[in-house]
C-alpha cells in the first residue's frame, strides 16, 4: 500500500526481505526502514564472533540518529523549499557526515571492545527529498534503479574488479566473480563515501541490497524480471528467494516503488532525468565514465535555459564556468555549430580563462553549468578526479589540434 514520506513529492511503497544463507551461522546484514525520515539503508557486516553484526547494526543506527537530527532535517527542509545548488550541497553534506559519523562510531566501539576489533561493514543509504533520491555508498553493496525498460546500477563496487564488471552505461556485464573489498566503514579512519543523486518518477523502482543478493543474478535481464515482479513485497521476496536458492551468504534487500506524485512544484529541480543524463554522458567530460561517477560529477551542475541570440559568459559571480549542452544549438561567430553533448569552455574547469569569440544560442537552449569551484570540490575524490582530468586533458588536446588546423 503506497504511503506518504514526509518532504517527498511522491507516494511510495516499500518492502524488506532477508535470508541468512545456506552455510552461515550468523546474520551479519542490517537494514533500515525509516519512512518517517525518508531514509532506507542496507549494511553488510564483516568480522568474526558476531562483530560483523555489531558493525552493520551500528552503521544503520548511527545513520538514522544523524539524519533525524536538527541539522539534517533543516538541510532537507531547505532543499524542499528551494532546490538550488547550495541547498543540494547541504543535503549531500549531511548525508556524508552521517556515514562518517557511523564510521567513527564503529571504530570507537572496536577500540573499546577487543572482540570487535577488525570489524567493518558496507553501507548504502537512500534519502528522499522533494523529487530526488540522495544516495551514499561505501563498500560492495549496491543501489539499482529500474525505470521503463532499463535497470541501472547506480553505485560502483569498492572492489578491485569493480570497473571491469560495469560497462560505460552502468549495465551489468555478467555475474559477480567476487574480490576483496577496498573500502568499508570501520576499516580505516577515513572512509570513502560516494555521493550521488537521481530524480525519480512514477513507476521507478529502487533496489538497495547486499552482495548476497546481486551475486546470484545472471545479468540485467534476470535482475529486471525479478525487480519488476508484482508489488515491492513480491519483488524483494523473489530476489531473496533466488539468493537463498543459489547462495551461501546473507542476503538483504529493500525495494522501493515510486507511486503517484501528489505535490506539484513550479521551481522543479530537474536534476538528471533519463534523457538529460544520456545527452550529458555524450560530452567529452563524461563519455564512457561509469554511471556512478557520472552522477557524482553532475551533482555539481545546475540546469539553465538561455534564450535565442543570448551569449554564454565564461564567468559567473567571479567564478569560471563550463557548460554541457542538453538540447538546442550553440553557434560560434565563425559559423561552427554544436549540439547536445557539447562541452563549452572546458579550460574553465582547470582555472584557465579561455580566449576567443563568445558563442551564442541559435535557439532557446538548455545547458548544464558547472562552476570551477564546484568542479574542484567533487574532484577531492582521487578516483573520480583521475577519470575527469584525463578526459579533460584529451579534450583540450583535441581542441588545440583542431584550432591549429583551422588556422
Predicted features along the sequence, with ranges:
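PP2C/PPM-type serine/threonine phosphatase catalytic domain
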Residues: 1-307, 320, 329, 349, ...
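Cyclic nucleotide-binding regulatory domains
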Residues: 310-364, 375-378
